[in-house]
Amino acid sequence: MIIRSPEPEVKILVDRDPIKTSFEEWARPGHFSRTIAKGPDTTTWIWNLHADAHDFDSHTSDLEEISRKVFSAHFGQLSIIFLWLSGMYFHGARFSNYEAWLSDPTHIGPSAQVVWPIVGQEILNGDVGGGFRGIQITSGFFQMWRASGITNELQLYCTAIGALVFAALMLFAGWFHYHKAAPKLAWFQDVESMLNHHLAGLLGLGSLSWAGHQVHVSLPINQFLNAGVDPKEIPLPHEFILNRDLLAQLYPSFAEGATPFFTLNWSKYAEFLTFRGGLDPVTGGLWLTDIAHHHLAIAILFLIAGHMYRTNWGIGHGLKDILEAHKGPFTGQGHKGLYEILTTSWHAQLSLNLAMLGSLTIVVAHHMYSMPPYPYLATDYGTQLSLFTHHMWIGGFLIVGAAAHAAIFMVRDYDPTTRYNDLLDRVLRHRDAIISHLNWACIFLGFHSFGLYIHNDTMSALGRPQDMFSDTAIQLQPVFAQWIQNTHALAPSATAPGATTSTSLTWGGGDLVAVGGKVALLPIPLGTADFLVHHIHAFTIHVTVLILLKGVLFARSSRLIPDKANLGFRFPCDGPGRGGTCQVSAWDHVFLGLFWMYNSISVVIFHFSWKMQSDVWGSISDQGVLTHITGGNFAQSSITINGWLRDFLWAQASQVIQSYGSSLSAYGLFFLGAHFVWAFSLMFLFSGRGYWQELIESIVWAHNKLKVAPATQPRALSIVQGRAVGVTHYLLGGIATTWAFFLARIIAVG
């Protein structure tokens, strides 16, 4: 008789076939809501349909079902992303001058779109050099493809097809994990396992495989390209992977294989895993060998991090323990209870993630120009400006989204009965002190930062330049910023002896790097003008935070409306008979926060655009004479409001205003059209609901007279709907206007 130990029970973490796949149900508009599914009585129905289609909280209160819907929707989102990527690569393969650009990136502009001559708009196809006519693109894809070692259009086709396959796979996964094998709630809440897999898998193995690709494919191919070898002569990627001798010709240590790794003689690999700092003078980008080294190091860190959390083996950290041990001398229960919040409220979790990702995106914006990662990126001024602007906008939206979901969490998921004296409770209990102090800071910053400009405008108008705040009169030098710049510029000889150059040329010290007579990067001087505009940045950011934080901290209750939580996330007013309680919902704070986010980002991208054109971007002659695009006028012009209007907005708008009849004319039309979209938003923001209801009723009367009245009764937009439409057009109109202004300018002069 054989005695066996009892088999360990495996936890079943999925439900099989929980929900049947029904096209009939999907075809019924509003199938997720009993009220909406009845069909339209009034035109408000279509608005409610859109507002609630993805508000899974309103479909059901079952957390497991909500989690499954979100999980499934994420696969749908990934599918769309793969489809978009595939389109980008397909355009590169089918409609672009990528191969020509690769052979001469300094004189040929990147283009991946050719306009068909339907009604004479082939004027939009400008000459980008090399005999190619098309629209100049500023997405940075060409530079990224070169960095990853793509040398011909066939490779782009293959990648595009691969992305389509992945898009289909994701679409299937979204259906499968909702209808066939849907994870149980416990699976979504198993944070340690999730951390291990995401850290070690996505970030660790992801970085490791990218480092491997760079070492075995990108580095050798880029070395050939930098040496001027014709792309058609360069061996194909698989040849480098399969034939070690090929690599050994470029990097002799490859002949030794993995021996130096196992014998800890790692310095052998210093040929292709470097620690140089600074920029490659041939391409004006970071050294690709530095980037490979970086990804290898990151991979090691995340592979270790992915083994830190306690799962089936009883060793490692437990998130709950970490959070509950986190107590300070003044924070009561500290983070106790936070674990429960973050595993039962996806809004709280999402809020945290959006705040982090938004901040990270803005960090990316600042690194893309100061440490340009791809070859020939730094000298493509249109792409530099686009990447900075794009990442700033995205970061701003994500941070506002963080506040939005924090407020939704407060209204829908926060349970005050179980929370006592933990960190969140303590913050809520002294919210008045927080908000009033923050308000004071905003007033101080606003008056002082704007006051400095007003002083300068006044002195300038009175003809008293000696009494202005400027580098040549009363100096307000940003001494702390300059100190940070100097510390970093001196780091290679002092605090980072292993590096040969500082991390970024912008810190100072180093010489400028120019590629093909164009400036890639140089030390950026900071002066009084930067000091002034930086305080405007501080002001706009603090006001944005004030609005958003007030929305979160007063989402459930306030002195004005103690029972706000019962009214929900968005509501127009606290019922009839209570004047002065309109526009106080958490949603309204997000609405107002969006406008200030727009203010903040606009000042940042204007500052960046002008500063770079004035002090960094430009050309260098054979004699070594440096000429900047706007000739260094930032320091003296941007210190007055009038200077911003005259020498930045007006002077630089000439290209977009005069673009008609040229290949940039689309930007002129967008500039006009986006101004209209923006102005259209004011109609929604400045007029009341009753005005439109009256107008509609008189129009309906006319229709009834002619017996053409519709069955669905027309209604004016609700207050919240009107404001939503208003802010959407305001932001889209403003962003598209800025886009047209920036690109027409920089493509014409850059």
Curated annotation (Swiss-Prot):
Binding site for chlorophyll a: M683, Y691
Oligomeric and partner information: The PsaA/B heterodimer binds the P700 chlorophyll special pair and subsequent electron acceptors. PSI consists of a core antenna complex that captures photons, and an electron transfer chain that converts photonic excitation into a charge separation. The eukaryotic PSI reaction center is composed of at least 11 subunits.
Protein topology in the membrane: Multi-pass membrane protein
Family: Belongs to the PsaA/PsaB family.
Residues given in the record as chlorophyll a' binding sites: H675
Enzyme class: oxidoreductase
PROSITE patterns named in the record: PHOTOSYSTEM_I_PSAAB
Function: PsaA and PsaB bind P700, the primary electron donor of photosystem I (PSI), as well as the electron acceptors A0, A1 and FX. PSI is a plastocyanin-ferredoxin oxidoreductase, converting photonic excitation into a charge separation, which transfers an electron from the donor P700 chlorophyll pair to the spectroscopically characterized acceptors A0, A1, FX, FA and FB in turn. Oxidized P700 is reduced on the lumenal side of the thylakoid membrane by plastocyanin.
Subcellular localization, as worded in the UniProt entry: Plastid, Chloroplast thylakoid membrane
Cofactor-binding details, from the entry: P700 is a chlorophyll a/chlorophyll a' dimer, A0 is one or more chlorophyll a, A1 is one or both phylloquinones and FX is a shared 4Fe-4S iron-sulfur center.
Keywords carried by this UniProt record: 4Fe-4S, Chlorophyll, Chloroplast, Chromophore, Electron transport, Iron, Iron-sulfur, Magnesium, Membrane, Metal-binding, Oxidoreductase, Photosynthesis, Photosystem I, Plastid, Thylakoid, Transmembrane, Transmembrane helix, Transport
Protein name: Photosystem I P700 chlorophyll a apoprotein A1
Gene3D superfamilies: Photosystem I PsaA/PsaB
Chain sites annotated for binding phylloquinone: W692
Domain of life: Eukaryota
Gene Ontology CC annotations of this record: chloroplast thylakoid membrane; photosystem I
Transmembrane segments: 70-93, 156-179, 195-219, 291-309, 346-369, 385-411, 433-455, 531-549, 589-610, 664-686, 724-744
Pfam families tied to this protein: PsaA_PsaB
InterPro entries xrefs: PSI_PsaA (IPR006243), PSI_PsaA/B (IPR001280), PSI_PsaA/B_CS (IPR020586), PSI_PsaA/B_sf (IPR036408)
Chain residues that bind [4Fe-4S] cluster: C573, C582
UniProt record, GO biological process: photosynthesis
Lineage, highest ranks first: Eukaryota, Viridiplantae, Streptophyta, Embryophyta, Tracheophyta
